[in-house]
Amino acid sequence: MADRLIVKGAREHNLRSVDLDLPRDSLIVFTGLSGSGKSSLAFDTIFAEGQRRYVESLSAYARQFLGQMDKPDVDFIEGLSPAVSIDQKSTNRNPRSTVGTITEVYDYLRLLYARAGTPHCPICGEQISRQTPQQIVDQVLVLPEGTRFLVLAPVVRTRKGEFADLFDKLNAQGYSRVRVDDVVYPLSDPPKLKKQEKHDIEVVVDRLTVKIAAKQRLTDSVETALNLADGIVVLEFPDDHDERGHPREQCFSEKLACPNGHPLAVDDLEPRSFSFNSPYGACPECVGLGIRKEIDSDLVVPDPDRTLAEGAVAPWSAGRTAEYFTRMMAGLGEKLGFDVDTPWRKLPAKARKAILEGSDHQVHVQYHNRYGRPRSYYVDFEGVLTFLQRKMEQTESEQMKERYEGFMRNIPCPVCQGTRLKPEILAVTLAAGERGAKSIAEVCELSIADCSAFLNALILGVREQAIAGQVLKEIQSRLGFLLDVGLEYLSLSRAAATLSGGEAQRIRLATQIGSGLVGVLYVLDEPSIGLHQRDNRRLIETLTRLRALGNTLIVVEHDEDTIAHADWVVDIGPGAGEHGGQIVHNGTYRELLANKDSITGAYLSGRESIATPTRRRSVDRKRELTVVGAREHNLRGIDVSFPLGVLTSVTGVSGSGKSTLVNDILAAVLANRLNGARQVPGRHTRVTGLEHLDKLVRVDQSPIGRTPRSNPATYTGVFDKIRILFAATTEAKVRGYQPGRFSFNVKGGRCEACTGDGTIKIEMNFLPDVYVPCEVCQGARYNRETLEVHYKGKAISEVLDMSIEEAAEFFEPIIGINRYLRTLVDVGLGYVRLGQPAPTLSGGEAQRVKLASELQKRSTGRTIYILDEPTTGLHFDDIRKLLNVINGLVDKDNTVIVIEHNLDVIKTSDWIVDMGPEGGAQGGTVVAEGTPEDVAAVPESYTGKFLAEVVGAGCAPARTPRRRRTVTA
């Protein structure tokens, strides 16, 4: 049927021969517990088959250049359209990619500036233009009649040389005079120039007086000068002097030229001239990157409260040379009047400058040799900054280079100030009335909302309007789509590598809407990630607009509002992993609310909920972590305190500065001080309260491994203990097997036919590569001899094939192993197989594996945990389990800080730091802080407005739209 999408017998991963009938041209939401099979059905089955069919429709020649996709394990799919996947995994890490380039807005801006921009001289700011010989003559003839002037052809501009050959050549061509460095000489007796000095040479083509009768002679002279000087002619007016007493000059050019005669290197403006990825436009200093690495004194002296003897100067505080450098600084102290036991911040400015930049004087270094005899010598004191720069240039060791780079920070290029473009390109502007004239770099620095407003206000002439009208329409269309998905706070110059997964996904979503495709199947992975509740409405409107074009949308989502606005909802479950893979509900949202078998329906209808705590943990304001003077990115020099021993949620709209504050500054400082890392923190003054902590644990949703060889058992370390246990069996001891025998990563115990993979890859040339079970080990990964060793009747491969829940029961008597496995069960991963390959784990599952790995370590009560949107990919019931784990950590007096938008997590927090009020330049401040009840009472807080609806109540049912599309079952 043309209006249906029918799936029969889907068995990918944990799917249990699923049959599904979906309406086309609809917004369909797939929901269910984490690991229930949503992504397996949406991405690995429906999208994979749609993509595969499209690729196979191409010629064999074309297919060899495209990534082939495996045929999913499904009987058949009917009514399938060409499929486009919009996920969160393909964030661009290229330093040259920006929001402007990946949305193609920058391409249109380049075209706009090339065709309608007004060029100026980058030196004096005067407008520059090109003119024909006729236009030049017409401008001269409007001068008062009788005005005397010389027609000069500048053949040399600020170049070194004697130029004797040039003078001879000009003399032979019939020219009689030449002006050299503002002095006129006859070519019959030219000056002898100094070879090592720069000179200006102009040929005197003619002497004329302004009068109509001389028009033809003037035209001939101007054309001669233009031909002689490569398109430039200079007129000197001997009777009219400037403020310095020099004769006034006027420069004309067939090319772009400064009217004040400043030398320019501007060719005809083309779109490539505005590209920082092209040599025609890129700043020559930074080759279009906009940044360069430079040693930062704040990183060299990270803790100004330390003394020099205590290691205040970080590069000189570690290793065997620390004592040598301390003695050297003591010698400098004798000369400048300070001692090494004074804290850095209390040292005189002159002393700090000398330590950093070096001293002109030799310093007297005194020490005792190994026999206790006093010794001394004199040495030049080069300064720590010079020392680091020299070492950086000299070393060939990657390890040492990495160490020195730890004291360097990316700073804007000093030539282009981070704009990436040449000065002459930055001098091309477009004017927008009261908003002023802006270069392409200045427009890209604006937020998308301000950029749209600026382009709307452009003042263009009739000619420019005719040229730029269509280009502006394309730009505004794309900017409008970015605004619709809640990205108004981003700038077009924002580096793609700094975007979160949610931001990158919404940019791709906006790009797809701009493409205007019809009849496409879009598969999206949680587009609401990283989006504040305030912006959800615009995202939903964007999705419905994409559907209205005539497309089918399948959205894997847990957000209540998105589910409530769906035309059709598929709930997959009932549990996760082996307990999931079935269709629990396939119908409308209202039918889902009434479905007694659906745990999703139970939470959405209010039958189940995550309760608001009846009492919150008390906050001790004397025990807190404080970031002072945070000013990285859009943070406005703010001071923020995080109470210790409680659960703190950092909230705020997208782009308000949450990740910058917590990840770029706080977590980086903690990692350096507590874990011995060498990260470069964002700009701030200091962080206080570190003495209350002894360890940092960061948990995000990045994969636990990139290859199938990584799995929950190897990541948590429990596999090492299992291998030791197998090596301790009687059979293993008889055979002399060590724990390494039971590893599938090294020779000895693994199957060498498949090198421990369990599968063999068969290349099929024009067809996708086929993976088949290894014929030797039948997918077990180990050789026959290793598999003959059993523990309680199970071989090592059979243990890896157990679910974690089964394994916990199997190893119950072995406390060291059971403790690891019980922790994985506690975070809701009992359904996952112990040896399940890491690439098959969802983001939520990977995060919980990491959390479990940390949980099984013994707690000191002085650990701080930082989690970045831990609810990503988690169902309501998964969130409940996660909160139980987090609260267990806090109950042991540890500190947990989460960056979060989910109201269930926020309402159960003990403390909230709400950033805002808006995103981008309008953000970067603390709007509210306190308990959830305190924040809910702050009218300026967007988070507070939504929090007020749920604080003190259970999980309220999602608001349903007033009007809904009718979908036939």
Swiss-Prot record:
It is found in: Cytoplasm. GO terms for cellular component: cytoplasm; excinuclease repair complex. Keywords: ATP-binding, Cytoplasm, DNA damage, DNA excision, DNA repair, DNA-binding, Excision nuclease, Metal-binding, Nucleotide-binding, Repeat, SOS response, Zinc, Zinc-finger. ATP binds at residues 32-39, 652-659. The keyword Repeat applies. A zinc finger (C4-type) spans 258-286, 751-777. Gene3D superfamilies: ABC transporter ATPase domain-like, ABC transporter ATPase like domain, ATP-grasp fold, A domain, P-loop containing nucleotide triphosphate hydrolases. Residues 316-599, 619-948 form the ABC transporter domain. This is UvrABC system protein A. Coiled coil: none annotated. CDD domains: ABC_UvrA_I, ABC_UvrA_II.
